């Protein structure tokens, strides 16, 4: 968690993806689209409520620390820097799997396959609107750019 927070805090600024470019992608290629996440976006999966621990420690809230239930089960978090600062929030586990695939620049189809139970179009639209991606391309093109 701390690594993701530090990464978000010190990530370079980057303009969010210009969504109009997505409209130019031919329908047969939609499943091959891959995204590049904003440099401040990170994903954390933990067996304990590390987000609650982080907040309690940051606010030096002994009552909140005492109230944390370590047996509450796993958490799936997204960490990002936005206009308000660094934020960490929970995602449903299937959405986290979907975003984990997308943030690894895997294809949209691979992300859908990793979380078939979600409404991928709605989830993707929400994350695009929030500016969590900065670039896209067909997966084969992105692999060449990154390597």
Give, region by region, the residue ranges found by the protein language model.
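Long, charge-rich, low-complexity alpha-helical segments
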Residues: 1-26, 84, 89-147
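Hydrophobic packing positions characteristic
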Residues: 1-86, 90
């Amino acid at each position: 968690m701390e690594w993701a927070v530090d990464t978000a805090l010190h990530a370079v600024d980057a303009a969010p993806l210009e969504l109009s470019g997505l409209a130019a992608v031919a329908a047969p290629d939609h499943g091959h689209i891959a995204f590049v996440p904003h440099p401040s976006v990170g994903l954390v999966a933990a067996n304990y409520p590390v987000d609650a621990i982080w907040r309690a420690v940051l606010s030096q809230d002994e009552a909140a620390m005492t109230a944390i239930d370590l047996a509450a089960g796993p958490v799936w978090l997204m960490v990002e820097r936005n206009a308000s600062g660094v934020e960490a929030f929970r995602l449903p586990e299937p959405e986290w799997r979907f975003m984990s695939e997308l943030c690894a620049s895997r294809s949209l189809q691979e992300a859908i396959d990793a979380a078939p139970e979600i409404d991928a179009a709605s989830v993707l639209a929400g994350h695009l609107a929030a500016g969590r991606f900065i670039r896209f391309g067909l997966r084969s093109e992105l692999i060449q750019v990154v390597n």
